[in-house]
Curated annotation (Swiss-Prot):
Organism: Mus musculus (Mouse)
Any one GO CC term of the record: cleavage furrow
Tissue expression as described in the entry: Brain, spinal cord, and heart.
Membrane topology reported for the UniProt record: Multi-pass membrane protein
Record's protein name: 5-hydroxytryptamine receptor 3A
Extracellular topological domain: 24-246, 298-307, 487-489
Length: 489
């Protein structure tokens, strides 16, 4: 007992000697803490023992909920050939980090702090449709609130795959999706929700640049839980970006020139079919339309899986021009046969000049009445045979007989030639007159045949013109109706 008392006294003495040193060190530490900025002290406090490789929850059974938001800023490019959409968006996301919480009163009432993104845990949320790295600005910081809420704001240039349907070009509406999902974590680890309500996301066009070729209709969000196998399920948030092309430029540069050329082709039917000007006019028009298609070929979207309807429209217009040229060649050939032309058959005369002319309200097309060819030939032969003179008074009274010769002044005032010489002279004269009459009748007959074929050609030309006009109008009305439905639906 006597030995313990000195030991106790020695311990008390030593504690009295060391107490002033420890107090001075504690006071020095407190002085140093108050001299440092609050943000620096808070950053050191939060990141001193932080492990960014671990999901920031105290209970591993609790999932980390990540709320995301997308605001469309601009449509930069729509590549129909490669099926790629380039957009510029404002992307926002926030989650709760349970390891980044503090009491604001301990740090000069600081409620939020910006810290480097590389220093903390960040969810691995990616876009499934990524096909290329966009030129997005780098934002290296995030905001952390005292309750552990982490806010990550950043603009993104997205180059994503999109199934583009160009059949309705230039009145097409495209629906492209942006699918945000965790590449590794299942829904038991990371769950995805919307930052704002779906109605606010759909109607938000506040920052969209609405001066380009494309018009933003809406951004429709949809949550979906999918699974690759039975045990693992993943959360994804899909944003459907619905855009519509402004068709005014393409209507002016593509549709109007084609419509003008087709109207000129229709007006070309006013040229008379018996002139050669219509054929050269149609050929020039067809050549001009071919040059027009070569010029606009680079403007049309080209894909390997489909052709726009406007491309079909151009091909059909080209086919109609070819049909119009073929019809013109047929009519010109029909009315220009002339000497080689046979008389119009009775069935064709009845069909075209009676029936079709009446249907087209062209009035009755008169046909020249010609006696049969056999009658004319027999009549000519009666006046040129060897028995001409004996029968002259009966069958050739239209030329004149010997009695008429006797009544002439020459016959009364001069002696008559011998009967033999008179008969030869009359025979030669009658043969010449018969040849002249035969030539004139043949010429008149050929002219009447040509006129008949010309009438047939005019009627067929009117018929084919109206059929062609109906085909052009029906095709144009169908396309305009379809494009109007697609544009205003």
């Amino acid at each position: 007992m006597r030995l313990c008392i000195p030991q106790v006294l020695l311990a008390l003495f030593l504690s009295m000697l060391t107490a002033p040193g420890e107090g001075s060190r504690r006071r020095a530490t407190q002085a140093r803490d108050t001299t440092q900025p609050a943000l620096l002290r808070l950053s050191d406090h939060l990141l001193a023992n932080y492990k960014k490789g671990v999901r920031p929850v105290r209970d591993w059974r609790k999932p980390t909920t990540v709320s995301i938001d997308v605001i469309m800023y601009a449509i930069l490019n729509v590549d129909e050939k490669n099926q790629v959409l380039t957009t510029y968006i404002w992307y926002r996301q926030y989650w709760t980090d349970e390891f980044l919480q503090w009491t604001p009163e301990d740090f000069d009432n600081v409620t939020k702090l910006s810290i480097p993104t590389d220093s903390i845990w960040v969810p691995d949320i990616l876009i499934n449709e990524f096909v290329d790295v966009g030129k997005s600005p780098n934002i290296p910081y995030v905001y952390v609130h005292h309750r552990g809420e982490v806010q990550n704001y950043k603009p993104l240039q997205l180059v994503t795959a999109c199934s583009l349907d160009i059949y309705n070009f230039p009145f097409d509406v495209q629906n492209c999706s942006l699918t945000f999902t965790s590449w590794l974590h299942t829904i038991q680890d990371i769950n995805i929700t919307l930052w704002r309500s779906p109605e606010e996301v759909r109607s938000d066009k506040s920052i969209f640049i609405n001066q380009g070729e494309w018009e933003l209709l809406e951004v429709f969000p949809q949550f979906k839980e999918f699974s690759i196998d039975i045990s693992n399920s993943y959360a994804e948030m899909k944003f459907y970006v619905i855009i519509r092309r402004r068709p005014l430029f393409y209507a002016v540069s593509l549709l109007l020139p084609s419509i003008f050329l087709m109207v000129v082709d229709i007006v070309g039917f006013c040229l008379p079919p018996d002139s050669g000007e219509r054929v050269s006019f149609k050929i020039t028009l067809l050549l001009g339309y071919s040059v027009f298609l070569i010029i606009v070929s680079d403007t049309l979207p080209a894909t390997a899986i489909g052709t726009p309807l406007i491309g079909v429209y151009f091909v059909v217009c080209m086919a109609l021009l070819v049909i119009s040229l073929a019809e013109t060649i047929f009519i010109v050939r029909l009315v220009h046969k002339q000497d080689l032309q046979r008389p119009v058959p009775d069935w064709l005369r009845h069909l075209v000049l009676d029936r079709i002319a009446w249907i087209l309200c062209l009035g009755e097309q008169p046909m020249a009445h010609r006696p049969p060819a056999t009658f004319q030939a027999n009549k000519t032969d009666d006046c040129s045979g060897s028995d001409l003179l004996p029968a002259m008074g009966n069958h050739c009274s239209h030329v004149g007989g010997p009695q008429d010769l006797e009544k002439t002044p020459r016959g009364r005032g001069s002696p008559l030639p011998p009967p033999r010489e008179a008969s030869l002279a009359v025979r030669g004269l009658l043969q010449e007159l018969s040849s002249i009459r035969h030539f004139l009748e043949k010429r008149d007959e050929m002219r009447e045949v040509a006129r008949d074929w010309l009438r047939v050609g005019y009627v067929l030309d009117r018929l084919l013109f109206r059929i062609y006009l109906l085909a052009v109008l029906a095709y144009s009305i169908t396309l305009v109706t379809l494009w109007s439905i697609w544009h205003y639906s």
